[in-house]
Amino acid sequence: MLERLNFIENKYEELSNKISDPSVMANQKEWQKLCKEHADLEIIVNTYREYKKAQEDLESDKEMLKEESDKELREMAQEEIKELTLKLEDLERELTILLLPKDPNDDKDVFIEIRAGAGGEEAALFASNLLRMYTRYAERKNWKVETISLNATDIGGFKEVTVAVKGKGAYSRLKYESGVHRVQRVPDTESSGRIHTSTATVAVLPEVDDVDININANDLRIDVYRASGHGGQCVNTTDSAVRITHLPTGLVVTCQDEKSQLKNKEKAMKVLKARLFEAAEAERAASIAEDRKSQVGTGDRSERIRTYNYPQGRITDHRIGLTLYKLETFLDGDIDEAIEALVTEDQAEKMKDLGRVN
């Protein structure tokens, strides 16, 4: 590990020199790329330097203990040695996590697709609850949310809805939300007070660059139609809504949020690319998952990941056995406690993988 950290520190110094070189700054595209690489290494280098400083201080205190005869100074040195030993253990753990393989999609913006599952109108209302939860979470993170498409019901639910979430680290946090979400509650329409179970499916897709995936124009069928709002009423007098069908896979994407047909087409193409990219990534991850049966989650949208129990005010994440009794605030976007636990578990699994490789 130390050899790798020394290499990273040297690379960081090299990048520091490059990004301050006027000749490199003249090429803005290259300069921005180097600045990002420099920023990505900064936390590792700073932590490593703190680790080296603690090591030096520890050796200094040990030397003092050998040479010093004053009782008070020896006690001070012994106390410092204890503190520095614990600090070095913490920093070593932190460095191990920082050196874990990074998900190349973590810095990307995302599309969140929410679809009502089993449960009819109640499932559609739950899909609406989930959309609000992610919207409120995005607000807490100062991320931007844009509606791409929606299929609303007459009483405020959604059969399906797609939104774009743009902001730093959006995918790194939201990627753990893919899967089947289950709700247990008494519907407003239930006169007998019986608890119903309904589901909604969430898919979180990283927005991909043109270089990540190529689409042949001949593989697309593009239809235009008039946009509709809640309950199906027409909200536009021109054919601005766009439906794109990817013929080889049968994937269909719609977008009706913008008044401009061109903008709707651009947004729909971004979603289509994200879906095709996800399909390719899922195929690749399937073989890896065979060796990681206990992993936090495959991101498979058929995997039941969480239950929201209204009578008990309880949320249970089935992947890690986490139970929280804060349903109201959770649905208001306070979901970081669950996400942090999932991140920690994911890191532990990656560390196990590294151990198997080594």
Curated annotation (Swiss-Prot):
Gene Ontology cellular component list: cytoplasm
UniProt cross-references to InterPro entries, sorted A to Z: PCRF (IPR005139), Pep_chain_release_fac_I (IPR000352), Pep_chain_release_fac_I_sf (IPR045853), Prokaryotic/Mito_RF (IPR050057), RF-1 (IPR004373)
Localization annotation: Cytoplasm
Post-translational modifications: Methylated by PrmC. Methylation increases the termination efficiency of RF1.
PROSITE patterns reported in the protein's UniProt record: RF_PROK_I
A GO MF label: translation release factor activity, codon specific
Sorted UniProt keywords: Cytoplasm, Methylation, Protein biosynthesis
Main location: cytoplasm
Pfam family for this entry, one: RF-1
Superkingdom: Bacteria
Record PTM N5-methylglutamine, positions in chain: Q233
Family the entry assigns: Belongs to the prokaryotic/mitochondrial release factor family.
NCBIfam families, per database record: prfA, PRK00591.1
Functional note: Peptide chain release factor 1 directs the termination of translation in response to the peptide chain termination codons UAG and UAA.
HAMAP family: Rel_fac_1
Protein name: Peptide chain release factor 1
